[in-house]
A protein has these predicted regions:
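Carbohydrate-active catalytic/glycan-binding domains of CAZyme proteins
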Residues: 1-138
Length: 138
């Protein structure tokens, strides 16, 4: 998924294994470019496909409670905040083999200018206000 912010383009991609249930290593990483066509780099200044690099900056990763955090989309709401929707497996949930949706606000690192979610983990079991959708367009 690609978004534009402050004249930069941010590519969000999933890395790791997905269809391994609670053993999934999926995570969302991000790279930045001056062009929508790339090349995209992490804050380590290495290209996302550089095997000696970090493959981008971590946005959201698996945790002790949620595995397989990936397949994302970004939503910008009327107050100009960005939100990320993605799926994951609740490891200790009633149906740990079923992927469930998550939504978290994207925060922006003041130093690297890269996006991430709070604690870089899914906000499971946390009460929070989500985005307000004013109008749906088809």
């Amino acid at each position: 998924y690609i978004i534009e912010k402050d004249n930069k383009f941010y590519y969000f991609g999933s890395q790791g294994t997905c269809l391994s249930g609670t053993s999934s290593t999926y995570r969302v990483k991000v790279g930045v470019s001056d062009s929508i066509f790339g090349p995209y780099k992490g804050s380590d200044k290495k290209y996302l496909d550089d095997v000696n690099g970090s493959f981008g900056d971590l946005v959201v990763a698996p945790s002790d409670e949620v595995a397989g955090t990936g397949h994302n989309t970004i939503i910008k709401v009327f107050d100009d905040r960005d939100w990320i929707m993605y799926h994951g497996y609740e490891i200790n949930g009633e149906n740990p083999t079923n992927r469930i949706p998550f939504i978290d606000e994207l925060l922006w690192d003041n130093d690297t200018k890269m996006p991430y979610v709070k604690n870089r983990k899914a906000s499971i079991h946390e009460e929070k206000l989500g985005p307000t959708i004013l109008k749906y367009k088809e």
